[in-house]
Amino acid sequence: MFLKSELLECNGSSVTLFQLSALQRIEHLEYLKQLEAVEVGDFQAAITFTVKSGAYLVAMSLWHGHPLKGSQGENAAAEVAKIQDEVMQTWPTELVAEAEYKVKLLSGMIAPVIDEPTSSGEERNEPAEPVTAEKPSPVS
């Protein structure tokens, strides 16, 4: 298999998350487009959208190593939908969000955050030396 994977652990249990395939990336965008019709100001719908889209992304990732894979014949979408329901019913929202983030990293959908050590001048966003428009004068 060509897909990258990463172990996700929580409360002594673990699952393997997989990178999304090219087809799954397309299906994810199509799924987001279907859910896109959230009205502005409808916070309940926005929260529901966020949880469902995260669970769907995680379900697509889990599908590669899930016992349901291949159980519906050629209907992978039905298998992913069952896994999505399982995720939404048994996972806390914090874990769904963490898994979604890891899948997006594995799949190259977001760039990894790189923590670079900063010098004391950069920490405060202040220049190391004062900048002026004047030419430096010779030292007397």
UniProtKB/Swiss-Prot annotation:
One BP annotation, GO: viral translational frameshifting
Gene Ontology terms: cellular component: host cell cytoplasm
Segments for region (Disordered): 114-140
Record flagged with keyword Cell membrane: no
Annotated keywords: Host cytoplasm, Late protein, Viral release from host cell, Viral tail assembly
Compartment list: Host cytoplasm
HAMAP family: GT_LAMBD
Free-text function comment from the UniProt entry: Promotes tail assembly by creating a scaffold for the tail tube proteins. Tail assembly proteins G and GT probably wrap the linear tape measure protein to create a tail assembly scaffold. This allows the polymerization of the tail tube protein, during which G and GT are released, therefore they are absent in the mature virion. The tail assembly protein GT is produced by a rare -1 ribosomal frameshift. The ratio of translated G/GT is about 20, and this ratio is important for proper tail assembly.
Family: Belongs to the lambda-like tail assembly protein family.
NCBIfam families named in the record: phage_lambda_G
Subunit structure: Interacts with the tail assembly protein GT and the tape measure protein.
Protein name: Tail assembly protein G
Organism name: Escherichia phage N15 (Bacteriophage N15)
